């Protein structure tokens, strides 16, 4: 069980982090308790052996979700992962460096642009931009 915070019921801004969005005049004080699971447990319970494309948009909690897919990732059973990096990562205290280090051994990272994919070969502090952007992690093998 976890707390989920939002500005109103059904809001697309919901997050497990109580975000300070007062600079946007958004009050993030609504709270509800939700049930959560891991990708590994969900796949095991539902007999899912392989995931071709996994899209994550969990408002800053992406790295924690990925850690809950340890067995599937270690076994090479997830091929492509799309995730978002942006302002929510300020609240979760995660940096792009954390994602780069998580993926660098088995995945090639790309930033999704309007005209295609930009490969991310090496980490640089210039990647620490907290404006929402989507990334792909594509399994190397």
Language-model region placement:
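Phosphate/nucleotide-binding beta-alpha loop and adjacent structural elements of enzyme active sites
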Residues: 1-141
């Amino acid at each position: 069980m976890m707390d989920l915070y939002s500005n109103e019921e059904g809001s697309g801004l919901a997050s497990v982090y109580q975000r300070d969005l007062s600079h946007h005049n958004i009050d993030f004080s609504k709270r509800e308790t939700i049930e959560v699971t891991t990708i590994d447990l969900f796949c095991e319970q539902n007999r899912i052996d392989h995931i071709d494309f996994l899209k994550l948009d969990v408002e800053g909690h992406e790295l924690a979700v990925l850690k809950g897919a340890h067995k599937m990732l270690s076994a090479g059973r997830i091929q492509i992962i799309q995730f978002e990096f942006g302002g929510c990562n300020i609240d979760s205290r995660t940096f792009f460096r954390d994602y780069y280090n998580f993926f660098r051994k088995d995945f090639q990272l790309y930033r999704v642009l309007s005209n295609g994919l930009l490969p991310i070969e090496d980490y640089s502090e210039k990647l620490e931009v907290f404006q929402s952007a989507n990334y792909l992690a594509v399994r190397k093998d």
